[in-house]
């Protein structure tokens, strides 16, 4: 599939030619990641960190912006990650994977008998965050591994380096540096040789400039990281996503599973052809192809129960798609919330409770208790309910009742302070990753 890249330099989103010459610059990173994440993973790269343009604390003009993006999508982050502490911090802040460049290699290698990798660092890194979270860059110039912001090469060939690097990574990112930003196509022969040499996931970058090349790389078994072609409009993520799907295997129809973003509950399953995907991306509402009516249909166009699309992800075989959605009403024609059960209502979740609280404050209804809660009163109720839960609840039923009361008042307090449950989940996830 396709991974969109957000490269940052001097606090701006940029695209460089050959890693040196500025071609374009923009300042809409938030809008970009919100758009890019609909189609797949997003690579966020700190070019200043890669080039060691840092202050005494190791920060760059991009640090604040980069950290703010990590929880806004399925993000892999790279650029200047040279120690385990930095990698752990980025993972704890929300990055799903880290991209290791120069630090992975033995840059002092002069003979074939010298080690290829910085094995001590890589072993410590895998122990700290897990091999599955590590990507190693096998960027190359004229077939030699490039380091230090692509300013130098080391005495390591692409293929021998890749064979060793896969021992410490879940995937390899290959950038053909001499093709980077040139919009002339990548080096397909080098990519093919790399793909045949290793067993892990391979992502190709540098020069990819057409849907035809993306499709060819997909058939080769490689994912593609897009930069210049995306920003200049030569390739759209919509077309790239669709071009990677295997319609031949499924007679032109791809099964699409709709999953509630908030509860992770499966809502429904339908089939989509290319035109249905195009309409889904255009409207941001999940659209299928009706095999009985032989036409496109957007879920909700009759009932008003639309499925607003957050993101789409293809499976490993590219013949099934998972759509993460925000449902507006139930999905099933029977009136049930989901097509996979008899429950007629949306499952109660903390997010749903929070949404109801927000609605009560925004549009108070006569007799609404929630709307009467001022800051002082809600804090008193949190303390009161916590005491009842810990001191008065004796039976299982008592604990359930008091815990529900406490969560309600905690949710009200959070709303008033501008904190939502996703913020809390992120903090819990951060603590888990730090262990």
Language model regions located:
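Short catalytic helix/loop segments, enriched in acidic residues and glycine
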Residues: 18-37, 62
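Glycine-rich, proline-tolerant flexible connector loops at the mouths of alpha/beta enzymes
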Residues: 41-61, 102-114, 174-184
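Catalytic cores of alpha/beta
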Residues: 65-98, 189-224
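C-terminal helical cap(s) of enzyme catalytic domains, especially alpha/beta-barrels
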Residues: 108-128, 214-243
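Flexible "arm" and connector segments at domain edges
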Residues: 159, 219, 225, 229-403, ...
């Amino acid at each position: 599939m396709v991974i969109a890249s957000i490269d940052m330099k001097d606090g701006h989103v940029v695209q460089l030619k050959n890693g040196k010459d500025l071609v374009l610059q923009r300042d809409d990173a938030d809008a970009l990641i919100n758009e890019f994440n609909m189609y797949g993973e997003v690579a966020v790269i700190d070019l200043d960190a890669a080039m060691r343009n840092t202050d005494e604390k190791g920060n760059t003009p991009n640090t604040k912006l980069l950290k703010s993006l990590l929880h806004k999508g399925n993000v892999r982050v790279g650029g200047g990650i040279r120690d385990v502490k930095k990698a752990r911090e980025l993972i704890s802040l929300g990055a799903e994977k880290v991209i290791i460049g120069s630090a992975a290699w033995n840059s002092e290698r002069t003979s074939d008998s010298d080690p290829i990798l910085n094995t001590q660092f890589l072993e410590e890194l895998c122990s700290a965050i897990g091999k599955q979270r590590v990507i190693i860059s096998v960027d190359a110039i004229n077939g030699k591994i490039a380091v230090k912001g692509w300013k130098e090469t080391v005495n390591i060939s692409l293929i021998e380096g890749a064979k060793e690097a896969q021992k410490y990574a879940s995937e390899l990112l290959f950038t053909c540096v001499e093709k980077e930003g040139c919009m002339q196509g990548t080096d397909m022969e080098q990519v093919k040789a790399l793909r045949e040499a290793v067993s892990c996931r391979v992502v190709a970058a540098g020069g990819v400039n057409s849907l035809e090349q993306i499709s060819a790389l997909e058939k080769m078994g490689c994912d593609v990281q897009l930069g210049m072609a995306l920003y200049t409009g030569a390739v759209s993520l919509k077309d790239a996503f669709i071009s990677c799907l295997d319609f031949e295997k499924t007679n032109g129809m791809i099964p699409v599973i709709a999953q509630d973003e908030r509860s992770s509950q499966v809502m429904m399953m339908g089939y989509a052809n290319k035109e249905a995907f195009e309409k889904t991306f255009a409207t941001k509402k999940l659209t299928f192809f009706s095999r009985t009516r032989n036409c496109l249909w957007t879920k909700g166009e009759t009932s008003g129960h639309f499925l607003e699309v957050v993101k789409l992800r293809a499976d490993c075989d590219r013949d099934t798609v998972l759509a993460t959605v925000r449902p507006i009403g139930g999905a099933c024609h029977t009136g049930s919330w989901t097509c996979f059960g008899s429950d007629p209502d949306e499952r109660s979740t903390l997010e749903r409770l929070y949404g109801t609280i927000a609605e009560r404050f925004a549009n108070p209804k006569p007799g609404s208790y929630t709307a009467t809660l001022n800051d002082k009163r809600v804090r008193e109720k949190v303390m009161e309910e916590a005491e009842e839960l810990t001191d008065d609840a004796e039976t299982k039923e008592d604990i359930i009742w008091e815990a529900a009361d406490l969560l309600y008042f905690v949710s009200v307090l959070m709303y008033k302070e501008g904190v939502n449950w996703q913020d809390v989940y992120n903090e819990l996830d951060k603590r888990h990753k730090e262990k």
